[in-house]
Amino acid sequence: MIKKLSVLATFALVLAPVQVQAAASDDTSYTWSTPKLVVTYGLMGIAESGSIRAGVNSAAFVDSAGRLRMIFEGGSPSDKKWSTVSSDGGANWSVDSAFRWPTDIQASFGHISVVAAPNGGYRGFVRNETGIASVYSTDGQTWTKESGLRLTPSAFGLEKLDGGGVAKLPDGRYRMYVGDESSYFRRCGSDKAVNTKIYSATSTDQLTWTVDSGYRIGPELGTRCNLHPHAFVDPSGAVGIVFHVNNDIEKSNSEWQSSCHYALSTDGLTFSAPKRIPATMKKTSFGTENMADDCDLMVMPDKTLRLFASLFGPGPEGNQIFMSTGTAAVKTTSTTAAPAATSPATTKITKITCVKGKVTRVVSGAPPKCPAGFKKK
């Protein structure tokens, strides 16, 4: 029996694989705009440097003022938390100088995700080697640390967690999705037979979590690493996980090195076959591949989507964040033109003269016919 967590999750993981799905195909449900960089060295007012990041590992949400807000780590020092805001849906961004992150939380806690808290405000989840911690804000701008950890790696039988994205379920509970970042570069970069899974835990208050049995995403994409899950609720009400897949770390395959994938579920446990989001950007420092890392997907009030992804690695493109807008694809159906209307045929009435002995009759018709015993004259 799975026991409830007080602050830390207890180990209660049973491997019960979900049905293996086919490898991901490109998403066609949405049309994705050409990605554009929204966190840049210029915006942050710093020079491009291999040791300083403009921004990576983002979380986006609509704050209490109705602005699109993004929190990420970057700048100098590179693990400091920053926030940018946009009042026009992401077309223009500015650094929020009034943003306040708690100083009493370790800088090593990264990969933030944000969800609306049950009693108002916002709760953010961050992780490091020890587990997943949480922070709280009433407005999305000023944050305070919450005591303890929400989940630990040992609760899942893992060495290190990543992700921590949370979605609200249809029944009012919350589900958190975490990835396996144990020995990340060794396993995902060198061991070609590796496959990392995405797991989940459930909560009623976002503070105490129960580990769910099995895994949510696993071998569906073959021997690749499924990393840094974020969660969202799509316009249809389905629960979604968005995560990035490493095709082959540190190797050029002239296609894509990493990209965002997402999968949907009606209950947050059993997911559809993952779809690959085609929005990526090129990184010349790694050859010709397209890249998208640490993906975050959110639904705007107008039901359009915003995808945020990091470009890791050295410049000139690296260590910046791009955005792509997703709009529901318009389904077209072929129609057969109706046949042209035809005018009714015109009926011509004619007359003939019919005789029978001395009797004569004029008959009209189309065509006219003489009565019985009469002959046409």
For each feature predicted by the language model, list its residue ranges.
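Secretory targeting and sorting signals
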Residues: M1-A24
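Carbohydrate-active catalytic/glycan-binding domains of CAZyme proteins
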Residues: S25-T332
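Short amphipathic beta-strand/extended segments with alternating polar/hydrophobic composition
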Residues: V126, T360-A366
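Disulfide-bonded cysteine motifs in exported proteins
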Residues: T138, S183, I349, S364-G365
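Extracellular mucin-like PTS domains
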Residues: T332-S343
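A short beta-strand micro-motif
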Residues: T350-K356
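Short Cys/His-rich micro-motifs in 6-15 aa windows
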Residues: F374-K377
